[in-house]
Amino acid sequence: MATLDVNPQRYQQQLAEKVQRLTDMFAPYQAPELEVFESPDQHYRMRAEFRVWHEGEEMYYIMFNQETREKYRVDQFPAASRLINDLMPLLIDAMKDNESLRRKLFQVDFLSTLSGEILVSLLYHRQLDDAWIENAKALKQRLNDEGFNLNLIGRARKMKIVLDRDYVVEKLDVNGKPYTYQQVENSFTQPNGKVAEKMLEWAVDCTQESQGDLLELYCGNGNFSLALAQNFERVLATELAKPSVESAQYNIAANKIENVQIIRMSAEEFTEAMEGKREFRRLKDNGIDLKSYNCNTIFVDPPRSGMDVDTCKMVQGYERILYISCNPETLKENLDILSETHHITRFALFDQFPYTHHMEAGVMLERKA
């Protein structure tokens, strides 16, 4: 993780700079007034990773200055959730005098939740043995006795030892309704829990009074699919990463939602299927007849690289396009194509990453008359 100057007194200033930047970037598209969704000014990040430095009997977390690459000690990390900050010193203190737990430990990853669960991954430059397992179990018990709802993972080359489970269960509040999400270690999850709730509420608001079905590309663990399902008859969602698809299925069942279907495909493959260029057995095996869907709305939340040209062309076939972007530069490139046929009716900034140059944006597009 990079150097981060978390200064609550600077929060509004850095947000205003982002608002100006995003507004200027999208002025050519006649975007409506920007809706701005703030982050907490500290303790907003649900996950954090630290390297571990050994110095004689001492052991502590370090990070690296992005510009100088110099290491510096980290005892607290204001960007991270209070849960992570509470656990950081207790974890290191519990391990530093234990040879089995500290030997060749080089990294600690934290994944926390608004629901109070936390998952810790300990990464080693050595193979882990039975002694490690016994000591790790004792460590987990000790921290749980101190009030943490904690699970533990040990990792080494080609090795993963899970003490109980390798995921947390998050609960996000969307307009007063709680949604349950399984978040698996090393899988993508929204890093800023409070802003994630605001993104879901905005997406639900944008799609009120929708008709027909929803098609969603890049659905991840079903983060948006579940909340948006209330506004549509059916949701058909695609995702390529197998762990995310498995989490999405878990989340559909956990939330007792019956009108969402997830299929494991890339956006590019789905485009080929929609255009009839290829037949995919997995569609048939899952009983999915694409022709039976009546999708007027498509939702996309692509990776930083945005959508390729063919996917953009396919997306243009829908009356309404809801697009969440973690990279406004590639959103802009995609809009050069999408704006030929659609215009922006809603425009939002979500401050997922305070005190950095990164911006998360949302646009709602509707077909031009």
Curated annotation (Swiss-Prot):
GO CC annotation: cytosol
Entry binding sites for S-adenosyl-L-methionine: Q190, Y218, N223, E239, D301
Biological process according to GO: tRNA methylation
Keyword terms of this UniProt record: Methyltransferase, S-adenosyl-L-methionine, Transferase, tRNA processing
Listed CDD domains: AdoMet_MTases
Pfam families to which the protein is assigned, alphabetical: tRNA_U5-meth_tr (PF05958)
EC number of this enzyme: 2.1.1.-, 2.1.1.35
PROSITE patterns, A to Z: SAM_MT_RNA_M5U (PS51687), TRMA_1 (PS01230), TRMA_2 (PS01231)
InterPro entries in UniProt: MeTrfase_TrmA_AS, MeTrfase_TrmA_CS, SAM-dependent_MTases_sf, TrmA_MeTrfase, U5_MeTrfase_fam
Keyword Aminoacyl-tRNA synthetase found: no
Family affiliation: Belongs to the class I-like SAM-binding methyltransferase superfamily. RNA M5U methyltransferase family. TrmA subfamily.
Function noted in UniProt: Dual-specificity methyltransferase that catalyzes the formation of 5-methyluridine at position 54 (m5U54) in all tRNAs, and that of position 341 (m5U341) in tmRNA (transfer-mRNA).
Protein name per UniProt: tRNA/tmRNA (uracil-C(5))-methyltransferase
Native source organism of the sequence: Vibrio vulnificus (strain CMCP6)
